[in-house]
Curated annotation (Swiss-Prot):
Species the sequence originates in: Polynucleobacter necessarius subsp. necessarius (strain STIR1)
Cellular component per GO, a single term: cytosol
Protein name: Succinate--CoA ligase [ADP-forming] subunit beta
Binding-site positions, Mg(2+): N199, D213
Listed SUPFAM superfamilies: Glutathione synthetase ATP-binding domain-like (SSF56059), Succinyl-CoA synthetase domains (SSF52210)
Amino acid sequence: MKIHEYQGKELLRQFNVPVPNGIPAFSVDEAVKAAEKLGGPVWVVKAQIHAGGRGKGGGVKLAKSMDEVKRYASEILGMQLKTHQTGPEGQKVNRLLIEDGADIKKEYYFSIVTDRGTQKNVIMASSEGGMDIEEVAESHPEKIIKVFVDPMVGLTDADCDIIAKGIGVPEASIPMARDVFKNLYKTYWDTDASLVEINPLILEGNGKIKALDAKFNFDPNALFRHPEIVAYRDIDEEDAAEIEASKFDLTYISLDGNIGCLVNGAGLAMATMDAIKLFGGEPANFLDVGGGATAEKVTEAFKIMLKNKNVQAILVNIFGGIMRCDVIADGVVTACKVVNLTVPLVVRMKGTNEELGKKILADSGLPIISTDSMTEAATKVVAAVAKNK
């Protein structure tokens, strides 16, 4: 689960991480009143959406007068803000953050993420703040430092000093940086976050360290422990198809391609998408029906996939362990009839009741392409899309 920047900064304040004074606004009038309350003389008008790159997209403006606050608020509220993370359609801006300007001497990058490979938390930091970390990793990988934190030990003073010196924090500011790093780690740990990203973390002219931005992701499996964080949820920022899928215990993530994927198991779903890309196709979604799929769940999965008008073919890839292939086959046949499927459908099933499942598909009279291997399935679904172009 993601939250807005202003909500992230509310959390940071609770954990004694310094952030600029700021007030959220939901209208132009509220933006002006917020600026008046803050006092100025410089304000930052910031679009609030669940995506990065807002500044490059025109969603962050520096205002030096009340007239500019009003003008920028009018321009940004309601706009379809397009960034590298929103996709070409962009996201509508319904909220603003009006914030005091900052005396920026130096910008740093700081983030904490969960590293499942090492079973540790990893802090990534860089002297190149304010930039996309992907760009820094590509052009100046030597400027990114990583510190792995054992969750049984926590972040130590020695860790903090390695980070601060590694990104070039002045000696006089290292004690404060140490406190900020520790409080950021405590925020991450105590809220069950899977990501905390501060870009930029700044050094002010007075030598103080401050978080100028705040991006959070939270482990959805831990949200039952944090009703105060669940209250931050903004459904308007979430994909409608993903919300609909969650009602049926389906795990769905929209992608940019044109081949719908219905798979059981996250690992098999990832492998299926890799196979599609290997043979020149582009997956339109990640969709895991889990181990307890019914005809109803499969039908709803088809409905959700086909709401994406870019879908030109569907690949169903099932491994029947706990899941029975005949149950999936019944669901596929039912779904095809309910949604009146008009795009090519490729089905590959292996495992429990595999032959019975294939017979159900063959006897349905529907133009379903049945395959035995993942390679064959991916090849045929990509070919079906190419043929229909």
